[in-house]
Curated annotation (Swiss-Prot):
InterPro entries: Exonuc_VII_L, Exonuc_VII_lsu_C, OB-fold_nuc-bd_dom
Key words of the record: Cytoplasm, Exonuclease, Hydrolase, Nuclease
Subunit structure: Heterooligomer composed of large and small subunits.
Positions in coiled-coil regions: none
Gene name of the encoded protein: xseA
CDD domains attached to this UniProt entry: ExoVII_LU_OBF
Organism, as annotated: Thermotoga maritima (strain ATCC 43589 / DSM 3109 / JCM 10099 / NBRC 100826 / MSB8)
UniProt EC number: 3.1.11.6
GO cellular component labels: cytoplasm; exodeoxyribonuclease VII complex
Protein name: Exodeoxyribonuclease 7 large subunit
Length: 394
């Protein structure tokens, strides 16, 4: 593909296919200011402009349809983007034109911004939890507004122990957008329990600053829970969609956020009652558990004692058996020793001497036969009470 050489027409045709085949550029609506209206050969050429951009448009056969465009009017045009191959330019082919008044313009911008935030998932993000008993509340509004007085009056009536921090900003007019963004950033620097954004009712134009995209994104950056109370019952701004809680009026927001002193006392009474009940139940449970453990320990101790007593008796029995076996062993061996003693005694060569016999020894050897002696031999005669020498004479 890198070596392929395109003609100008091929490039333009390829771009035309890409653009006209894109569903996001087909049958869409665009709003802007009508400028440079140029009727030509039954067609109407013009531009839709805004501060820093321009879109060339054409209505084919516009003259025949009786369409008359007015310079400087805001309009919503419907159609599709197309490419004009001979010039290599794109343009918007219009199928319908609808003029917009101020309210219509605001509605278009409202829907466009809301859709953009929705597609980014910013409207479906998890909501922060608003504390039941806040102590430090930041209020973003005009210091001279009736909305602020509504909040302060509600706080006084409810006698709630809270601290209020006011972050001043204009809430309508040319400077409102910039001041509101600064107030939001300032509030984000404080250690607050929540932030309230409040303003009294007004026209769509008066409330428009709360629909500005950069203001909405700044609200989303707040690290505190956000509660809005903007306008009256019928008013609805984009800030309400991104807030963690949205109320219809400043007073409604204040009543939601600021607890009544009586509610605090009731909640405290309820809390202590629940605490006492919980502690009592826990005490009873622990008491039963200790009783069970005590019973088990007693049973274990008793079983161990019984087991030890059994072991002691067993040892005594074994000791008695061992003692008896030892006595029997000693007695048996004593008899054997006595018998052996008698046997040894009977074998004693000196025993016959007591009965008058004489033991004849020659050279310390016992003479058993007469032939062991000859005449003249000197022998020892062993008597029971001594020894004598003798000589053989015959």
């Amino acid at each position: 593909m890198k070596d392929y050489t395109y003609s100008v027409t091929e490039i333009n045709e390829y771009i035309k296919d890409l653009i006209e085949g894109d569903p996001y550029l087909t049958n869409v609506s665009v709003y802007g200011e009508i400028s440079g209206v140029r009727p030509r050969k039954g067609h109407i050429f013009f531009s839709l402009v805004e501060e820093n951009a321009r879109l060339e448009c054409v209505i084919f056969g516009g003259d025949n349809m009786g369409i008359r465009l007015q310079e400087g009017r805001m309009a919503l045009v419907e159609g599709s983007v197309s490419v004009y191959i001979p010039h290599g330019t794109y343009r918007f082919i219009c199928s319908n034109v609808r003029y917009l008044d101020q309210a219509g313009m605001y509605q278009i911008k409202f829907e466009t911004t809301l859709k953009k935030l929705l597609e980014e998932g910013l409207l479906s993000r998890p909501k922060k939890t608003v504390p039941r008993f806040p102590r430090k509340i930041g209020i973003i509004t005009s210091r001279d507004s009736a909305a602020l007085q509504d909040v302060i009056r509600t706080a006084r009536e409810r006698k709630a122990p809270i601290e209020i921090y006011v972050f001043h900003t204009s809430v309508q007019g040319d400077s409102a957008r910039e001041e509101l963004i600064k107030a939001l950033r300032k509030a984000n620097e404080y250690d607050l329990d929540l932030v309230m954004i409040v303003r009294g009712g007004g026209s769509k134009e008066d409330l428009w600053v709360f629909n500005e995209e950069d203001v909405i994104r700044e609200i989303l950056r707040l690290r505190h829970p956000v509660v809005t109370g903007i306008g009256h019952e019928i008013d609805r701004v984009i800030a309400d969609f991104v807030a963690d809680v949205s109320m219809h009026t400043p007073t409604g927001a204040a009543e939601y956020v600021i607890p009544d002193a009586s509610e605090i006392h009731e909640d405290l009474d309820s809390f202590f009652e629940k605490l006492i009940t919980s502690l009592s139940n826990r005490f009873d449970m622990e008491e039963r558990r200790l009783e069970t453990l005590y019973f088990r320990l007693r049973m274990i101790g008793r079983r161990k004692l019984e087991l030890n007593e059994f072991k002691i008796e067993r040892v005594k029995e074994l000791a008695a058996k061992l003692r008896k076996k030892l006595m029997d062993y000693f007695e048996h061996n004593q008899k054997k020793l006595d018998s052996l003693g008698r046997m040894l005694e009977s074998l004693n060569p000196l025993r016959p001497l007591e009965r008058g016999f004489v033991l004849v020894k020659k050279d310390e050897k016992i003479v058993k036969e007469s032939t062991d002696l000859k005449r003249g031999d000197v022998v020892s005669l062993v008597f029971k009470d001594g020894t004598k020498k003798a000589q053989v004479i015959g």
